[in-house]
Each structure stands twice: as C-alpha cells, then as structure tokens.
Amino acid sequence: MGFVLVPKSDFQIPLEADTIDPICLKGWDLDEIRSLQVYEGNIKRPLGEFFEIAETSHEDQLIRIDGDVSRVKYIGSGMKSGKIIINGDVGLQLGCEMKGGEIEVNGNVSSWIGMEMHGGTIKINGNAGDYVGCAYRGEWRGMKGGKIIIQGNAGNNIGGGMMAGEIYIGGDAGNFCGIRMNGGEITVRGDAGRAPGAEMVSGIIKIHGRISSLLPGFKEISTFKEDGSLMILFKGDLSEKNPEGNLYINYNKNLHILENETDEGRVITKKGIKVIYNSGSTIREGQIIKGGNKLTDDYIDECARCCISPEDYKLLGEPENVVVSSHGNEVVLRAVEDPGIQMGTIFIPRGIWANVLTPPYTESTGSPMYKGVPVYLRKASQGERILSAEELVEEYGVGK
C-alpha cells in the first residue's frame, strides 16, 4: 500500500521532514503516519498538520506528493528502498545520504540534493540548484554511489568531493563542476562555467558544450569522436599530487580555449589584457606569517607580487608593477616574469592582496575558490603604488 501527501497550504516556515521515507511508512496505518513528527523551525509538529494524507492502491513502499514542497527539506533523507514521486518543486537536501530506492521529481529542486548519497537513483525532470552530490560543509568526501539524473540545468559545485556514482545533467552546469573530484562520472550535455575539474585527482567529467575557462593544471592527451562530436581528453588537475582525473571537452565548441593565442593576436584594452588568476600559499609565506604577523616588509615582498608568463610580461612592456582588477576591485602588485607560468594566466600568493580579487561566490564547502578567476592585467602608471596590508584592510575591509 502506498500513500499520497498533499500540502494543506503554503509553508510559512521551512519544514524538516526526513520522516517522509517509504520504509518509515511501511506497515503503518493512516493515524500513525499523521502523527509522525516533523520540525517546523525548532518546534516538533505532527506531519498531518501540514499534509492531507490518503492511502493509494499503487505499489507498496510508494509515496506520492502532489504540490509545492519547495520549503520542505530532507525528503527521502537516508532512504534505503521504495519510491517517492513529487509532482511539484522541492526544497533543500532531497535524498541526502540516500542508500537505495528511487526519487523522481516533476519540477525543480533546490540545492544540496543527493549529498553524500551511497546508492539509489534521483531523477529531476527540471532544474537543480548548487552542490548536487556534494559533501557536507567541512567534509571532503561527497557522493559515494548511486545515480543523479537532472534533465534541466544545474548550479555551481556539482559533484564536489565526489568519490563514486554518476551525475547526468541534460542542460547547463555552473562553475567548478567536479571540484575536488575523487571518482565517479559527471556528464554535462550543455555548457559549463569556469574551472571544471578544479583540484580533481580522479574520476571522469564530460562536457559536451562550451566551458568558460580551463585551468592551467590540465594537459591535453588525445582527440576522439563520441556521439558524432569531436572530443578532447585532458588529464589533471596537475596542481594536485598524482592526479588521474579525466576531463573531456567538445573541440568545436571550445576553440576559444584550444587555439593558442600569440602576442600579435592579443589585444590590450583600457582595462588591460584578460587573464586567468590562480592563487595558493607559498612556503616562504608560511615561514613569514608563522606567529600571525602579516604586517611586515617581508610579507609585502612575498605576497604583493604577480607572476606573469614571459609572453604576457613582454606584451605589457616589461612593467615594474601591474594592476590586477576583478569585480570592481583592483590591486597594484610587483610584476615578476616567471617561465613556469602559462600564457594567459597569472599567479598571486594567497594573501590579503589575493583576497581583494577573489569573489565570495567562488565558495566551495565553505571557502572561496582561489582558482580560475577571470581578471584584467595592465601596466601600472607612475602614480599607482602597492598598498600595505593595513591600507588594503582600510580600503576594502578584507580580513587580516
């Protein structure tokens, strides 16, 4: 025997309803199901206070929800068997830690679906939010099995920390698809944002559309045809230890990335040249700030610098200082020609100057993502100088 749940009215306060699980309802009568407890805010209330609940003659362990439950969280959390069909939009953390069974949504879903799931199938016949199949905040191991199918578009950080399983996106994906991926497979039939596969060490990502930018830590390996499209395989992310990640992108839709630009073909606008900014902590930086002091001349010398490829350094006129600008902020940095930097990218040590340039929306499991940020780079004028850490804190409010 299955059950049908219909919301009695709009939800004024979000509900936490992990009790909506086929195995929890098996063998229960209607009165027992109506008395199951859910959280409205921090107050426990009976499920029957919010839903009309009726029996249905459909298959056993089937729950059908008819209506908008976009403010209901944790539906199918930890689910092991059975099926849930939702005809409407759904809230956060659908099917998190799911181990088996099937969830199908005829609508859109919010973020964090399939968090750390181990098995089962989630099918979304609409769009999904951010962090699909991702890890919890503070954790690094995401989805460990199962399958997530999204027929529409999905947001940022898809498959973050993914260990195993499959994610299929029929539309577009946002930024950092497959970030810190350790296994499994992600397929995106449409376009994707910037930096797919950032910090991945294993697994497969296939993007059949256009990507905004490719991190320099990916090495081109081979070209082949798949489903009539010419695809290129990249290995990476080479910024990680012993990486075995496989990133496939569509050749014809990514000529802006694949065709090597020459000095003659690059244009310097009023803002400068467009490059990809990456950041990371350095050994010397760690030695300097041991003890917490970031206000020394040594700290400025190490962190207020911009490493530039020889080609871009020459294109800019071999400057002493450069201005790097991003999302309305800009910093002046000492220019350093570095043969180890790929043309079209720059490296800035992770410090207060880098924080000014790193947009907050690049977050990944709680921290901003200091890789793959599009910025502009130009030669500094005579009156533009490098600001101290104190001056940057005063001007931009970035933390020490």
From Swiss-Prot:
Disulfide topology: none
Annotated GO MF terms: formylmethanofuran dehydrogenase activity; molybdenum ion binding; molybdopterin cofactor binding
Residue spans of the Sequence repeats: 76-88, 95-107, 114-126, 140-152, 159-171, 178-190, 197-209
Pathway annotation: One-carbon metabolism; methanogenesis from CO(2); 5,10-methenyl-5,6,7,8-tetrahydromethanopterin from CO(2): step 1/3
Pfam assignment, any one: Molydop_binding
Region 7 X 13 AA repeats of [GW]-X-X-M-X-X-G-X-I-X-[IV]-X-G, residue ranges: 76-209
Top-level enzyme category: oxidoreductase
SUPFAM superfamilies: ADC-like (SSF50692), Alpha subunit of glutamate synthase, C-terminal domain (SSF69336)
Organism domain of life: Archaea
Function text: Catalyzes the reversible oxidation of CO(2) and methanofuran (MFR) to N-formylmethanofuran (CHO-MFR). Can only oxidize formylmethanofuran. This enzyme is oxygen-labile.
Similarity remark: In the N-terminal section; belongs to the FwdC/FmdC family.
Identification of the protein by name: Molybdenum-containing formylmethanofuran dehydrogenase 1 subunit C
The species this protein was found in: Methanothermobacter wolfeii
Classification lineage: Archaea, Methanobacteriati, Methanobacteriota, Methanomada group, Methanobacteria
